[in-house]
Amino acid sequence: LDLLLAAAAAARDRRRLEREELGDVGYALDDRRRGDPVLLVRDGVTLHVTLNRPERRNAYGTQLRDALVDALRLPLVDESIERVVLDGAGPSFCAGGDLDEFGRTPDAATAHLIRTRGGAGRLVAHLAGRIEVRLHGHCVGAGIEIPAFAGRVVAHPATVFRLPEVSMGLIPGAGGTVSIPRRIGRWRAMHLFVT
């Protein structure tokens, strides 16, 4: 609750500052010039959220995760956002966890907190009725675990889905053990997990 209240206060402050800088056009504009890991574009009542690390196939690293979490908190505190569209720039929606960051958390407790409290899956689940995720290219690990929480998922016919964690002796860390069986059933999820 404290985290949500802090996020709401930060979002209010951000909106106020951006209104002062931009006039009353809104608080989310296309920021491609700055190379942000997540781009936000407000179009009326719709917030477009784009994963923006195409050179890394939108690998789900710390910066992208934190920026995505911030972006997904906006519709929770701004009731004028009726719809969220989440997609990815470049050839893939999301290639899963950023392998350059694996094993870099200082301890197991921090890693657990990041997985259970710091990820985007819970926010996507909370926004399920208002969010559409558009998938293309490769959707690996977090790239399918998080979208599976959404109310509407649209995938290009050539999209490739993979959950390699189990074959590496790991548990899917972005909520896939919950989201994927709920979305496609436990038997299909099991097949996806072990193949």
Enumerate the predicted regions with their spans:
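Crotonase-superfamily enoyl-CoA hydratase/isomerase domain that binds
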Residues: 1-26, 175-195
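Conserved CoA-thioester-binding segment of acyl-CoA-metabolizing enzymes
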Residues: 15-89
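Hydrophobic/aromatic residues within transmembrane alpha-helices
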Residues: 49, 86, 98, 146-148
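Nucleotide phosphate-binding site architecture
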Residues: 57-58, 100-103, 190
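Hydrophobic alpha-helical membrane-association signature
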Residues: 64-68, 116, 146
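Glycine- (often His-adjacent) and acidic-residue-rich active-site loop
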Residues: 88-123, 139, 169
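Crotonase-fold acyl-CoA enzyme core
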Residues: 123-195
